[in-house]
Regions:
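Acidic helix-start/capping segments at beta-turn-to-alpha-helix junctions
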Residues: 84-98, 127
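Acidic/histidine-rich, surface-exposed loop or edge segments in extracytoplasmic proteins
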Residues: 44-58, 89-93
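Bacterial N-terminal signal peptides
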Residues: 12-21
């Protein structure tokens, strides 16, 4: 085998090895894909109307306004014989809406949840972890709360799925 051809084979082999190494390194550094939001948190994806309501303040009046908005929307579309799916997404100080120890509206949430299967209450796991750390004890949530990794990301996901966005 002539030396020139042997050099060419060596160079091609080295180039292929380098290429495979780069692909393997890039794959190893690619962060794992985040799991999509839990299916349990989806209210009714087939609902004709879909609404996301944001609560990010620890204010009883804002929490009640969010619940009023939800109930008014439910009543409006029920009167028209149409379905609506509503997710109330809490994060930051708004997580108090779903905290078992500090929610000023937990009885109302329980009542509304029992009456409306297409109404979901979403709690931000990031906020829950931060509040637990700051308080030095686990933050427990009411039973109606469904925990998602990030409240803000959940709002983004809902908007990309065609949910109308409301911030009372």
């Amino acid at each position: 085998m002539p030396m020139r051809r042997l050099n060419r084979i060596v160079w091609v082999g080295a180039a292929l090895a380098a290429g495979f190494s780069l692909v393997a390194a890039a794959h190893a550094q690619t962060p794992p894909k985040q799991a999509p939001a839990k299916k349990a948190a989806q209210t009714n994806p087939a609902a004709k109307h879909k609404v996301a309501i944001q609560v990010n303040t620890n204010d009883k009046a804002v929490m009640n306004l969010a619940l009023n908005n939800a109930q008014n929307i439910i009543d409006f579309y029920k009167g028209k014989g149409e379905t609506v799916a509503i997710e109330i997404v809490t994060y930051g100080p708004g997580l108090h809406m779903l905290r078992d120890d500090s929610s000023p509206v937990k009885e109302r949430i329980t009542s509304m949840s029992l009456a409306n299967s297409n109404l979901a209450f979403i709690a931000c796991a990031n906020t829950q972890a931060n509040q637990s750390k700051a308080e030095g004890k686990p933050v427990t949530l009411i039973s109606e709360a469904k925990v998602m990794p990030s409240g803000v990301v959940r709002l983004m996901e809902l908007q990309s799925q065609g949910y109308a966005y409301i911030r009372p």
